[in-house]
């Protein structure tokens, strides 16, 4: 049973997932928060501050014209007051209210930050809507537009908004002082805003010569030093905190404790980059968007280290290299990675306009910094961020100055430590099989109950889709659905999830999966690729799944076996939003369009189950696809119901035509 975040039951369950060291650390945090309420820390005096962390000559000129054009178009939309966050269009950006949630119409209350119930949507509104604007990543876009065009309108808008934000958000007051990841990303944005505005006459007056700015920067850094994410929460949040802290202590190293914070942040960054990443290079949260977020943050931090001539531990570069190679390995033919686990559209550093491919941009940066492998997919798009980061980051050395690393000679398809396997076939057939751990750390905050699920695409089109995430706070019914077992392409027993949820970011019992067979190369040679795995998430039962992709027939076979006592079964297949389905009995005819061409497939479903098509249902939710955080649209879900007696398997065959 899931408890609402912040309820007594939730606190008990959350406490049960902590170790003694984490409990002690959090107790110390609570005491410090109480002490700071009556005796807040004070920013020391700063004199002679100068900003020297500028872009090298030629970095802006290296931006491709089409990338610059997209950036300026985006900046002009922002200047006109238009922006969209998580499916909500705003037209008030010319003079924003920093505490207002346009989705619910609520305004977050003022008060001591640690007393604001930011998880309570009835009191605060949708906290993600409020926080996103104050990451100030739209300001880095405006600042980049100034750097490229020299048009001072962009710089003046940035300055006006920063002064407005600083005036409205005094240190330790309001919702923008409650979450470390927000402070860390905001600091990184400020570093880049100052860098990109360096040619503007008012830049120094806005930052280093401005006591208000100095006070804000110092308090952000002091907060992050005092309240790091700990123990079971040391996931992508702690990396954002460390990256922002490190960037600020390098670029804004004007305070008496800057050198110590820089060393501490770099040590934390190195430790947690390693801890959050499998040796194969995949992110341990097994939530692909967070792989992208962590990689962006790591590259941005590395840029600050190299620019400031601060020696980063060699393992930092090594982990980022492995992450980049892993990303290149798992994307489909259209450079789309898996839709595994939670996704909230979070970015580390934004200097590009709409239409820039996030994953192509990361691979382009990886090429510039580490060098591409022959098997990497081609990246044809351009972006603003890559030439800027590449101007700051030293190329990966080939002279033995880093730990020995052997990069894959051919494209990896099976990541044993992460339990992720990609089967590839002709005509752009791509199948991701999940036999890995249930998320990261004891709470597995961003995991879904999706053991043994498959995700299938052809030429980048979702055919058997992972439905996505949609929401975090405020809509518990939808949060439960999108992370449920029924909400994925796998088997549900007894109307229960494979793993047990204790809250919206808390799992109290984790299904354990193991891969038994992984032979992904067969289909590439014209034969058959094979994968088999099982999990023990259902007590007294074991679910085993076999997947075979045969190149010659363009056929994907999925065989599900359930060993154990007789139980009710639901087998779900979620179709992508572009797929039209005509279900007759246990056969579904699928059709869609790609680049103006008609495509089709047939899905033969197990006849032992009774099949129904569901689309856009709300009570309970079923038949939905979330293309991005805060957005959902109806899509067809095929659900077969029946019973498993442990004797026979359920066989599904997907045949692609043309």
Language-model segments: what does each one mean?
Residues 97, 102, 409-411, 419, ...:
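Beta-sandwich/jelly-roll carbohydrate-recognition scaffolds of carbohydrate-active enzymes
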Residues 2, 184, 343, 348-355, ...:
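CBM-like, beta-strand-rich accessory domains located in the C-terminal region of large
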Residues 282, 286-464, 516-519:
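Carbohydrate-active enzyme catalytic cores, enriched for enzymes
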Residues 27-121, 128-132:
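Extended, charge-enriched "interface" segments that sit outside catalytic cores
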Residues 14, 18, 26-30, 38, ...:
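Beta-strand-rich N-terminal accessory domains
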Residues 134, 241, 417-419, 450-452, ...:
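Residues that flank catalytic or metal-binding motifs in active/ligand-binding sites
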Residues 1-27:
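Boundary detector for helix-to-coil junctions that initiate low-complexity/charged tails
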Residues 110-112, 119-120, 124-324, 328, ...:
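Aromatic-lined, polymer-binding surfaces characteristic
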